């Protein structure tokens, strides 16, 4: 069993007799000398989809739930349901739009490296790759010779995601975005 300080985002844990998915972790450090670090976790109940916040001491032991990862591709939208197809055995996994709204900012028909996390064969989350390539749909005009400056401007992707990009980047260009930090990394390889 790992300690609370070793738990990572998207881990499936057992707590109070239920299985939860860890969606966010914040480390809280008290200002006293004797204060131990606390880890505040945003947990989503796998069965009901409800969310709760729990705090754990850094050395508190946490039980991991048994979960599996399946490589998937985005397939289609059916009303409020987003359907992802297993890349190996073509099993469909349905997600309600509200449960994956943050992940949808990075998902297009061409997104590679997506994985579905399942607990007891039930889909509980979409795991994004570390980086995604996306095409800029809207940004201010590029400025020639601006590659020497570090100034940025907002750029909006087709999914609605907004990231800061260097001034020399133009609309229609494909860029690489870090999914964890929602930041521009570089121009994407044009293949």
UniProtKB/Swiss-Prot annotation:
Molecular functions per Gene Ontology: translation elongation factor activity
Recorded superkingdom: Bacteria
InterPro entries from the UniProt entry: Elong-fact-P_C, NA-bd_OB-fold, Rib_uL2_dom2, Transl_elong_fac_P/YeiP, Transl_elong_KOW-like, Transl_elong_p-like_YeiP, Transl_elong_P/YeiP_cen, Transl_elong_P/YeiP_CS
One term under GO cellular component: cytoplasm
Alphabetical list of Gene3D superfamilies matching this protein: 2.30.30.30, Nucleic acid-binding proteins
Any one of the GO BP annotations: peptide biosynthetic process
SUPFAM superfamilies assigned to the protein according to its UniProt record, in alphabetical order: Nucleic acid-binding proteins, Translation proteins SH3-like domain
UniProt-listed SMART domains: EFP, Elong-fact-P_C
NCBIfam families: PRK04542.1, yeiP
Family: Belongs to the elongation factor P family.
Alphabetical list of PANTHER family matching this protein: ELONGATION FACTOR P, TRANSLATION ELONGATION FACTOR KOW-LIKE DOMAIN-CONTAINING PROTEIN
Protein name: Elongation factor P-like protein
């Amino acid at each position: 069993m790992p300690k609370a300080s070793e738990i990572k985002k998207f881990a499936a844990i057992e707590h109070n007799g239920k299985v939860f998915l860890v969606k966010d972790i914040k480390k809280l450090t008290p200002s006293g000398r004797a204060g131990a670090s606390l880890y505040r976790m945003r947990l989503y109940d796998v069965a009901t989809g409800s969310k709760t916040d729990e705090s754990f001491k850094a050395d508190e032991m946490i039980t991991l739930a048994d979960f599996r990862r399946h490589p998937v591709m985005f397939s289609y939208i059916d009303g409020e349901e987003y359907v992802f197809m297993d890349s190996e055995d073509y099993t469909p996994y349905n997600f309600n739009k509200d449960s994956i709204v943050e992940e949808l900012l990075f998902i297009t028909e061409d997104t590679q490296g997506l994985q579905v996390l399942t607990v007891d064969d039930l889909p509980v989350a979409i795991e994004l790759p570390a980086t995604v390539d996306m095409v800029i749909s809207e940004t201010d005009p590029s400025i020639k010779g601006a590659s020497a400056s570090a100034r940025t401007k907002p750029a909006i992707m087709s999914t609605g995601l907004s990231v800061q990009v260097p001034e020399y980047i133009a609309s229609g260009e494909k860029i690489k975005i870090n999914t964890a930090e929602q930041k521009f990394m570089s121009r994407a390889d044009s293949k």
